[in-house]
Amino acid sequence: MARKCEICNKGVVAGVQYSHSHRQSKRTWAPNIKKVKAIVKGTPKTVHVCTRCLRSGKVQRAI
C-alpha cells in the first residue's frame, strides 16, 4: 500500500515515542490511506487518498 496521499502529499512522519519512565524509542506515524476509485481529469482512476481528504470532499468518487 502506498504511504503517501496523492491529493495533499501527506506522508509518513518519524519521531520519538516516550514511555512512562521516559525511555525513548524511534517510531513512525503513517497517515490513514485508502485505495479509492475517483474521477481524475474526467476518467475514473484508482488513487491512494488519506481519509482527511475523503471526508473534506477533495476527491470526487467514481461510482
Swiss-Prot record:
InterPro entries on file: Bacterial_rp_bL28, Ribosomal_bL28, Ribosomal_bL28/bL31-like_sf, Ribosomal_bL28_bact-type, Ribosomal_bL28_sf
Protein origin, superkingdom: Bacteria
GO MF annotation list: structural constituent of ribosome
One GO-annotated biological process of the protein: translation
GO cellular component: ribonucleoprotein complex; ribosome
Pfam families in the cross-refs: Ribosomal_L28
Coiled coil spans: none
Keyword list, A-Z: Ribonucleoprotein, Ribosomal protein
Stated family: Belongs to the bacterial ribosomal protein bL28 family.
Protein's name according to its UniProt entry: Large ribosomal subunit protein bL28
